[in-house]
């Protein structure tokens, strides 16, 4: 308190601490450098030694300034000079006569920062310094910027109004100067305006997007100014849409284009992240679409870019992925073809038999039965990407595809026995291979070989064989009686055997046999049946039956008589044949009896008859099983079966055999009751045969 009192006395304050003097002013005033500020102030003093016409003078001084000799920073006393540094900038705008001491400070400078006090003079008594009630002026750096009000998005071709305001205005302060600069205004130009705000109108163009617009505010002649720059956002449809891919959390890369659409290959189970971004104003709505199915989408204010994660890609994830970007001004889209590669899966064979339209699905190791002669179509099917190379093999050999364009299809128009075996479909792929096999089993109806019979000491022994798939069953019929097992009276004995597709059966008949013996062997399976019969027919006078029933002597006699007749016939024919040609002809030995040429036509089911048109007993499908009769014994007989008789002695008139020829074969036809001539087609080409008919009356 002592220092202000001392200063008051030194500076001529005669009314120090007089309670009749008071002043109201803010203690601290802050102003940015270069700006203008008004400091409101009011004061009061006693009405003593002055009248209404007495002039009142007010002064603002910097602290520690001698009021009688020092220069004030501002005063209303015209004859009193002010400080040079504040001249024209500091102004006492208040009327001291009315108790107003307001001060305006323009273009504040850093050196203006100080403590200021007010002094009043009126008449001889009022001479007072308000030393304790001044204010402190603080000058700061100019950091404040003007505010620009502009729509967030500008429509191209539509006029827009922009306002620039600097929020620092006082009534006594002069307004700043506003100006505008920017690429959008280059063709229109702007002029500086003096006001507390500025209004700008212009028409944005599409190319004005992302350009700058700046509002400048100037406060003094020394170039102190403030400015605010805004970035123009002119609306436009989505553009520059970009798709990128991240594999297994690696940095995203753009896919390589293949044609007009980028192409991406990924292995099954791999992690993929598809990213989509587009440039648009306002921000576009992004979406990922797979075959018209929306997988992911984002709002305009959502994160950018839009990601689509495929943690472990599957075969079903393959397809065309489309990213769409859309706003009110338009849309844009871009596609990506994703191919998920994987090795063959679910390899199987589809089967169609006999031209059926229904396909049967078979797995690995399946056995497939097919009837001989039917058509068969095998289709190998698998799932893989890229498609696997398919091929068919049998017994290690690659089969030619039925359709070169589709090697997985194997067609067998007519299944034959040689097709039987394992067929394998191979599916080869860079990522792995698979194969599937099926076993083809060819089924066919029985093929009968036999029956054939021979006389033995115990009686008549007959054998019969048949080949079929599945293996056939054999049974014997004696007349209308089925012979099964063994007879309790030991009159017959049946012995079956089998080996693979062959079935064999032996029949032994004991005891006397009737003259009307009819013995039949029947073979059957699920696909058909075939039978062959052996007949022993009686002659009208009972010669043959008597020979069999009355014993060996009578049989020998009849046989000798027969051979005697044949010998006479041969002797009669041979001279004629020798005169016809000198070239020796091969001769065939015969070991037949009178019963050798009794024609017996075997009966068979429809399937067996059909098979008999394709194959003969002379070419069996597989090697004959043990005990089966040789087909050579049936040569030139065409399903004629006989009961063998005793051996025939050679005629003494026959020429001896040469090394390269055999005995000449002659035929004797026995007709019961009439003659059946043999067809000429049965004779070998170039061979002449003579026939003699022997009739039993």
Curated annotation (Swiss-Prot):
Q: What SUPFAM superfamilies does this protein's entry cite? A: Immunoglobulin
Q: Which GO terms describe its molecular function?
A: carbohydrate binding; phosphatase binding; SH2 domain binding; sialic acid binding
Could you tell me which PANTHER family the record lists for this protein?
SIALIC ACID BINDING IMMUNOGLOBULIN-LIKE LECTIN, SIALIC ACID-BINDING IG-LIKE LECTIN 10
Q: Which residues lie on this side of the membrane: Cytoplasmic?
A: 572-697
Q: Which GO terms describe its cellular component?
A: extracellular region; plasma membrane
What biological process terms from GO does the record include? adaptive immune response; cell adhesion; innate immune response; negative regulation of inflammatory response to wounding
Q: Which residues carry this modification: Phosphotyrosine?
A: 667
Designated name of the protein: Sialic acid-binding Ig-like lectin 10
> What does the entry report about post-translational modification of this chain?
Phosphorylation of Tyr-667 is involved in binding to PTPN6.
Q: Can you list the disulfide-bonded cysteine pairs?
A: 36-173, 41-101, 164-215, 276-323, 380-425
Summed up, the tissue specificity of this protein is:
Expressed by peripheral blood leukocytes (eosinophils, monocytes and a natural killer cell subpopulation). Isoform 5 is found to be the most abundant isoform. Found in lymph node, lung, ovary and appendix. Isoform 1 is found at high levels and isoform 2 at lower levels in bone marrow, spleen and spinal cord. Isoform 2 is also found in brain. Isoform 4 is specifically found in natural killer cells.
Q: How does it assemble?
A: Interacts with PTPN6/SHP-1 upon phosphorylation. Interacts with NCF1. Interacts with CD24; the probable CD24:SIGLEC10 complex is proposed to inhibit HGMB1-mediated tissue damage immune response. Interacts with HMGB1; the interaction is dependent on CD24. Interacts with RIGI, CBL and PTPN11.
Ig-like V-type domain segment(s) = 18-121
């Amino acid at each position: 308190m002592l220092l202000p009192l001392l200063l008051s006395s030194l500076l001529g304050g005669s009314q120090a601490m007089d309670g009749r003097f008071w002043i109201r002013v803010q203690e601290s005033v802050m102003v940015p450098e270069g700006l203008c500020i008004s400091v409101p102030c009011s004061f009061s003093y006693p009405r003593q030694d002055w009248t209404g016409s007495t002039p009142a003078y007010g002064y603002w001084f910097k602290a520690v300034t001698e009021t009688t000799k020092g220069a004030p920073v501002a005063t209303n006393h015209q004859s009193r000079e002010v400080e040079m540094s504040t001249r024209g900038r500091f102004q006492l705008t208040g009327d001291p006569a009315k108790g107003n001491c307001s001060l305006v400070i323009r273009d504040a400078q850093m050196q203006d920062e100080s403590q200021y006090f007010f002094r009043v003079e009126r008449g001889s008594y009022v001479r007072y310094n308000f030393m304790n009630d001044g204010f402190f002026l603080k000058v700061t750096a100019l950091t404040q910027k003007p505010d620009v009000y502009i729509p967030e998005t500008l429509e191209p071709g539509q006029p827009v109004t922009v306002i620039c305001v600097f929020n620092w205005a006082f009534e006594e302060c002069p307004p700043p100067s506003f100006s505008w600069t920017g690429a959008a205004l280059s063709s229109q130009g702007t002029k500086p305006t003096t006001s507390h705000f500025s209004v700008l109108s212009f028409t944005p163009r599409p190319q004005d997007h992302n350009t700058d617009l700046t509002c400048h505010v100037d406060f003094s002649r020394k170039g102190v100014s403030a400015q605010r720059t805004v970035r123009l956002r002119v609306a436009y449809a989505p553009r520059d849409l970009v798709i990128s891919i991240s594999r297994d959390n690696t940095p995203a890369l753009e896919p390589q284009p293949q044609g007009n659409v980028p192409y991406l290959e990924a292995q099954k189970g791999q992690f993929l992240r598809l990213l989509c971004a587009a440039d648009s104003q306002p921000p576009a709505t992004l979406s990922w679409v797979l075959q018209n199915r929306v997988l992911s989408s984002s709002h305009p204010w959502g994160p950018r870019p839009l990601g689509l994660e495929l943690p472990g890609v599957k075969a079903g994830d393959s397809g065309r992925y489309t990213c769409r970007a859309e706003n009110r001004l338009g849309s844009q889209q871009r596609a990506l073809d994703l191919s998920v590669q994987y090795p063959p899966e679910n390899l199987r064979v589809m089967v169609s038999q006999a031209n059926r339209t229904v396909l049967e699905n078979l797995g690995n190791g399946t056995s497939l039965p097919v009837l001989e002669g039917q058509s068969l179509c095998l289709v190998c099917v698998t799932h893989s990407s890229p498609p696997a190379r398919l091929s068919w093999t049998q017994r290690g050999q690659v089969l030619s595809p039925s359709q070169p364009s589709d090697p997985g299809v194997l067609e067998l128009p007519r299944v034959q026995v040689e097709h039987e075996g394992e067929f394998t479909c191979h599916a080869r792929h860079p990522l792995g291979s698979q194969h599937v096999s099926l076993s083809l089993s060819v089924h066919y109806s029985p093929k009968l070989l036999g029956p054939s019979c021979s006389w033995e000491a115990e009686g008549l022994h007959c054998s019969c064989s048949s080949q079929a798939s599945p293996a056939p069953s054999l049974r014997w019929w004696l007349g209308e009686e089925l012979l099964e097992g063994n007879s309790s009276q030991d009159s017959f004995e049946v012995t079956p055997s089998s080996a693979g597709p062959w079935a064999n059966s032996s029949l032994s008949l004991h005891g006397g046999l009737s003259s009307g013996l009819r013995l039949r062997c029947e073979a059957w399976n699920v696909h058909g049946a075939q039978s062959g019969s052996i007949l022993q027919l009686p002659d009208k006078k009972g010669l043959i039956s008597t020979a069999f029933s009355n014993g060996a002597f009578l049989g020998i006699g009849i046989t000798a008589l027969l051979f005697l007749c044949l010998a006479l016939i041969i002797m009669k024919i041979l001279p004629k044949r020798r005169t016809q040609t000198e070239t020796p002809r091969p001769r065939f030995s015969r070991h037949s009896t009178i019963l050798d040429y009794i024609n017996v036509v075997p009966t068979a089911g429809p399937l067996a008859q059909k098979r008999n048109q394709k194959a003969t007993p002379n070419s069996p499908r597989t090697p004959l099983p043990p005990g089966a009769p040789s087909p050579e014994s049936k040569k030139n007989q065409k399903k004629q079966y006989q009961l063998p008789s005793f051996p025939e002695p050679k005629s003494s008139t026959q020429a001896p055999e040469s090394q390269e020829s055999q005995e000449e074969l002659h035929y004797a036809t026995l007709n019961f009751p009439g003659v059946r001539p043999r067809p000429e087609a049965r004779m070998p080409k170039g061979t002449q045969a003579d026939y003699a008919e022997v009739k039993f009356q």
